[in-house]
Amino acid sequence: MPKTDIARRVYNHTWKLDPIIRSLLDTDFYKLLMLQMIWQLYPDVDATFSLINRTKTVRLADEIDEQELRDQLDHARGLRFTKKEMIWLAGNSFYGRKQIFAPEFLVWLAKFRLPPYELSRRDGQFELTFRGRWAETTMWEIPALAIINELRSRAAMKGLGPFTLDVLYARAKARMWLKVEQLREHPNLRISDFGTRRRHSFLWQRWCVEALKEGIGPSFTGSSNVLLAMDNDLEAVGTNAHELPMVAAALARNDRELAAAPYKVLQDWNQLYGGNLLIVLPDAFGTAAFLRDAPDWVADWTGFRPDSAPPIEGGEKIIAWWKKMGRDPREKLLIFSDGLDVDTIVKTYCHFEGRVRMSFGWGTNLTNDFAGCAPTEINGLNPISVVCKVSEANGHPAVKLSDNPRKATGDPGEVERYLRFFGSEDFVEQSVRV
């Protein structure tokens, strides 16, 4: 693939629309895995997704032009999966398994298009909402976030000249390569790209993926971005997300169903997938509550992804639970993915080395680390914590607690109800940067 001069491309403003989303495969792999499950098992469920900017000091609607945002969202709505993409999805092996996507699902997917959106402004923030069938609205999460983040990057760089942009990207590349050199010191460490949703830009994420592929070789295990995995002959990686237990809990008709919701979606998942895809995400309503009530069969799954507790603390908690359940942690897998950068990755790897298998999903600090790279300080290049979460399912409010109270989402009254029901044991409040 020919190399792109990113700085020159950013400076060139001659086109009417420079699309941010160029393909429906420009999404995280777990969205497709979850989509197949939703399409098969929850075809009649409605789900609303809402944009949430947790960095309240950044007024997105003041930084991003509303018409540019609408143009990018409209462009994404016009995309379809191409014939080449459908052939690749049907014929490629994922996690060692052929035909992971059912033929009838692929027939439906070939006709898929993103549903309508609702966009307004309030108090300097965008209110961006997607309503409809869960099997349609779920696919907006990643492109919506990628569009918001790249438009913010573009706005921050709009007034920069070509040489300033050259310096900006040269410094960002040098910073990234220093991280690669740190990772080389640990050849048994396994790391993948999880950086799509809050990336600086598509072209920059592509550069980072290509740099990791060359720089750390077999230690780089793949990308969550399906398009980049396809184009770079990499493994598409990813398992499942919080939206599954969030929707299941919102649909619960009584306390018994609410308590069972986190485990019901795992049983649903197990109907479709197995092996290395049996990864538990335990923190939707708090890891302590999940482990306290987890059935014995959960301990037979391949591994866990602790996503909101400090990585060493979260990993130790899960290892202790495996031992309590009579399982050997050395045969299990921990996937760390919450706000990681190289120093945290290396520290966590060295702490657990030899005690458990590990993999690291490197996200925003891989694909959007531009703070201080411009010749003058540009706040718009600093990453923010923006998410797109399920807010309703069949008209019922959806909630996420997490192990970090600052990452909780949902109606405040419902959040309080969930806290009373599941408890808040071992919650650790931490600042949320990304």
Curated annotation (Swiss-Prot):
Its EC number is 6.3.4.21. Keywords: Ligase, Phosphoprotein, Pyridine nucleotide biosynthesis. Pathway: Cofactor biosynthesis; NAD(+) biosynthesis; nicotinate D-ribonucleotide from nicotinate: step 1/1. SUPFAM superfamilies: Nicotinate/Quinolinate PRTase C-terminal domain-like, Nicotinate/Quinolinate PRTase N-terminal domain-like. Signal peptide: none annotated. It is an enzyme of class 6 (ligase). Transiently phosphorylated on a His residue during the reaction cycle. Phosphorylation strongly increases the affinity for substrates and increases the rate of nicotinate D-ribonucleotide production. Dephosphorylation regenerates the low-affinity form of the enzyme, leading to product release. One of its GO terms (cellular component) is cytosol. It comes from the Bacteria. One of its GO terms (biological process) is NAD biosynthetic process via the salvage pathway. It catalyses: nicotinate + 5-phospho-alpha-D-ribose 1-diphosphate + ATP + H2O = nicotinate beta-D-ribonucleotide + ADP + phosphate + diphosphate. Pfam families: NAPRTase (PF04095), NAPRTase_N (PF17767). The modification Phosphohistidine is found at H242. Disulfide bonds: none annotated. GO terms for molecular function: nicotinate phosphoribosyltransferase activity. Catalyzes the synthesis of beta-nicotinate D-ribonucleotide from nicotinate and 5-phospho-D-ribose 1-phosphate at the expense of ATP. NCBIfam families: NAPRTase, PRK05321.1. Belongs to the NAPRTase family. This is Nicotinate phosphoribosyltransferase. The gene is pncB.
